Amino acid sequence: MSRRHFGYQDKVLLLQHGSTELLALAQRRGALLHKLLSGTGIFEQDLHKPLGRLHHTDWLTLLQNCRQQVQSPELPYLLGSALLNSRYISLCQSLQYAKNLRQALAQLYYFRHQLFPCFYIRLYQQQHCIVLEFKPALGLANQQAFMLTVLCSLLLSLIKQQLGTLSGISLQLQQSEESPALQQQLFGGLNLSFNQVANSLSIPLALWQQEFSHANAAEFNAARRTCRQLNRVLPTQRALPESICRLQRRALPQLLNQEQVAAALGLSSSSLKRQLSQHQTNFASLLDEVRRDAARQLLRQGHYSNRQLALKLGYSDEHNFRRAFKRWTGLIPSSFKGLFNFN
């Protein structure tokens, strides 16, 4: 049986799915290749191999080197656009030939391990919008905001390119505001907000199935076949934190302990604990995250009392749930519920 999760030292990233584009952008801005590759296990000749791979430790080092040598706030935005328009990435080609946004995002999510294995998405409907909530699948240290910007840049560039507008779309970010003039320049027409409880992109339902300007079923199917062939080299795997959150969500309102989760993932309890420390997290924090996300999703529906929510989340006492929710969001449940219009 193949492994269901990967670690920092597993080569699950293709060099031509991000690294070569990033290096090209940095070199055009005066950075030297040998300095960009310093501290990684990547050699210059590896960059020309169609299926050359690297692991996340090298990827994070590469990002750090580029950001140190290229003091350019637009770098993640440009990288997202470069990925979308790369002729070497079949997944991105398929997005541009998709019938509509719904098909494109389904394609991106299914094959995300080929391009963005560091994120997964929670999708839900809120009033007249579809909301994509971005969750880190593994620890990205101080590169998380950069990588999230790359992903959002790719998605928003796709929408702007295919539908001609970002009107009605909202991007909510947990981070504080940075380079507001640049963000407005690159994402004009977008409603941007910062210091939010989650990273999410809200898209009006009207745009969800609007036909793409470059829709082409034959080209889409051809690109999708190439993505499937690439799965032989990059089989579908998930990072350990994501796998744990997935197990805990399925188990609610029951709570799995560390030994149960480790057994389900084919690990010893000590190995699970050690690997989580490499992701700068721990078992209790991931359980907290699952409960917080489930609580917010249930509260958005507007149908549950605090007692019902406590039972659904595995709390024996509703007061413990209220305290936990206040710690997670800074709000009591009733105040959070009041942010939404349930009519």
Which residues make up each language-model segment?
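Extended mid-to-C-terminal alpha-helical interaction segments
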Residues: 177-343
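N-terminal low-complexity or simple alpha-helical regulatory segments
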Residues: 1-128
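Short, solvent-exposed positions on alpha-helices
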Residues: 34-35, 146, 285
